């Protein structure tokens, strides 16, 4: 009986060693089950026809930023890595805004009230927008945060970065798009 349990455990571990890397391959998270290949591309044309609400309830059209380099950062107040990258994003926006770069924070938080209290405490100098269901349709499902999209002036996603971004990564991506 014990040897069967050991054999079953070994088989499960071997299967996990094969399946997990396959699931974590680049581009795997950009597709949801039942979605045709390429429907949620990590690179390619961004859907700028999306309208989201800001912390004050105002509608913000992403199309209004066409012609600018867009750093689109999906985050949440309860996310530790997101909180750590906020100073990087604040500095990035201050450094590049006069060169036609905009940083947009897309928050997964439930209420705008939460953000109106949080953003000033973190000295967030860039627009904060609220996540809506149609974001997933436009950019693919978000399975974890932070996720950062780098979008060129022509509206093309040049990179989708999962996890926190460093200052060096942001500078490299933005300079390539300027």
Question: What are these language model-derived features?
Answer:
Residues 117-125, 130-177:
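Thiol/disulfide oxidoreductase modules built on the thioredoxin-like
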Residues 50, 65, 74-75, 118, ...:
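Conserved hydrophobic/aromatic "anchor" residues
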Residues 83-122, 131-138:
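Structural microenvironment flanking redox-active thiols in thiol-disulfide oxidoreductases
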Residues 42-44, 49-70, 93-96, 139:
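A short beta-strand-turn-helix
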Residues 71-73, 105, 149-150:
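Hydrophobic beta-strand core positions in alpha/beta domains
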Residues 1-49:
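N-terminal targeting signals for export/organelle localization
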Residues 66, 74-91:
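Conserved redox-active cysteine motifs that mediate thiol-disulfide chemistry
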């Amino acid at each position: 009986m014990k040897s069967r349990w050991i054999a079953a455990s070994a088989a499960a571990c071997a299967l996990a060693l094969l399946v997990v890397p396959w699931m974590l391959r680049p581009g795997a998270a950009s597709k949801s089950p039942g979605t045709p290949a390429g429907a949620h591309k990590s690179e390619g044309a961004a859907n700028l026809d999306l309208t989201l609400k800001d912390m004050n309830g105002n509608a913000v059209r992403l199309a209004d930023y066409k012609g600018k380099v867009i750093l689109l950062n999906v985050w949440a107040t309860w996310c530790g890595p997101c909180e750590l990258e906020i100073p990087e994003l604040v500095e990035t926006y201050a450094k590049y805004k006069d060169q036609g770069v905009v940083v947009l924070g897309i928050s997964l938080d439930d209420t705008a009230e939460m953000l109106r209290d949080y953003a000033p405490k973190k000295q967030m100098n860039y627009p904060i927008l609220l996540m809506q269901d149609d974001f997933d349709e436009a950019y693919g499902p978000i399975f974890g945060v932070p996720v950062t999209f780098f979008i060129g002036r022509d509206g093309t996603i040049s990179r989708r970065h999962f996890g926190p971004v460093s200052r060096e990564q942001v500078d490299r991506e933005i300079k390539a798009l300027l």
